[in-house]
């Protein structure tokens, strides 16, 4: 993993920033300090930035120890657990059950990953290395799973007849939740067992870094509280490890759908609030455009700054349409 000089040595800020952030949070909830004001918000912003970079370090230590593609899976699973917890907490606390929260979160995650993160990585990597290669077999396989799940979850609900509106009937929702989890599980099996070589860097040999000890890995696992996947993907692309960058990005999107939908389905059925999953027409156009552009980008197995620019333009369109519908 790029950016790790000595996996056995932990920079002081890697533990100081999360500890200080936790202390500030505890003080806020105990009433010892006010909840608003520059005196609190400025240190909170600084500590959040420090915690993000600390998480990058801990995530890379763990990923370096377990190796690819397992490292990418660890990162994707960590952020998805946090994401699911936030969505479920919103659904349980909102008076109306926040039926569209899962849809908006999943759609935003797909657009941010496929266009924002991937576009930035391709642009940065292309500017530094001119042209980068990756294994098209693994990338297109992941994209195929992502496209299938995105269509089932975000587009098909608009065209079902059993329930009015962009929502599934309970039986349909259970089916989609089961196939989402099953297809994600099948993808993990292919990525880690059956065709693991599809997701490794081309020409990967021995790691250029010393492997961290089990003690160092356990220490980083305990401190890995959040996942700054965009930074991790960007650093991998900068280090000319585009396959790792794509594994992180696409794996994050797949985990978002494959794990979020089953979890929110259980909550939806438990509290009796139907999930609004179908996208509006304009968002469907952006999703289809993103999948189409990603197919062209990943099918070639080579990328330049041009592909990065295309994805960033689509991401900019998503931001504009979201701000000014």
Range-by-range predicted roles:
Residues 1-325:
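Hydrophobic alpha-helical segments, chiefly the membrane-spanning helices
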């Amino acid at each position: 993993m790029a950016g790790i000089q000595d996996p056995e040595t932990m920079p002081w800020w890697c533990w100081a920033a999360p500890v200080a952030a936790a202390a500030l949070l505890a003080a806020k909830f105990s009433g010892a300090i006010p909840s608003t004001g520059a005196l609190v918000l400025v240190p909170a912003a600084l500590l959040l930035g420090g915690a993000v970079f600390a998480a990058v370090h801990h995530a890379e230590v763990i990923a370096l120890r377990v190796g690819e593609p397992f490292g990418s899976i660890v990162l994707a699973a960590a952020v998805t657990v946090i994401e699911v917890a936030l969505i479920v907490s919103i659904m349980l606390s909102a008076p109306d059950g926040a039926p569209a929260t899962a849809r908006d979160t999943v759609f935003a995650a797909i657009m941010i990953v496929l266009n924002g993160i991937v576009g930035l990585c391709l642009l940065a990597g292309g500017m530094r290395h001119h042209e980068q290669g990756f294994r098209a077999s693994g990338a297109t396989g992941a994209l195929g799973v992502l496209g299938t799940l995105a269509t089932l979850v975000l587009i098909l609900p608009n065209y079902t007849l059993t329930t009015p509106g962009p929502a599934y009937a309970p039986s349909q929702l259970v089916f989609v939740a089961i196939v989402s989890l099953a297809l994600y599980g099948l993808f993990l099996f292919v990525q880690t067992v059956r065709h693991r070589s599809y997701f490794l860097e081309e020409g990967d040999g021995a790691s250029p870094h010393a492997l961290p000890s089990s003690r160092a890995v356990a220490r980083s696992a305990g401190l890995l509280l959040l996942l700054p996947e965009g930074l991790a993907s960007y650093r991998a692309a900068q280090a000319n490890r585009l396959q790792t960058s794509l594994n992180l990005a696409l794996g994050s999107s797949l985990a978002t759908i494959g794990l979020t939908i089953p979890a929110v389905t259980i909550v939806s059925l438990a509290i009796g609030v139907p999930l609004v999953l179908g996208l509006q027409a304009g968002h469907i156009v952006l999703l289809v455009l993103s999948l189409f552009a990603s197919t062209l980008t990943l099918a070639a197995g080579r990328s330049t700054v041009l592909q990065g620019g295309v994805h960033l333009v689509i991401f900019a369109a998503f931001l504009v349409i979201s701000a000014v519908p």
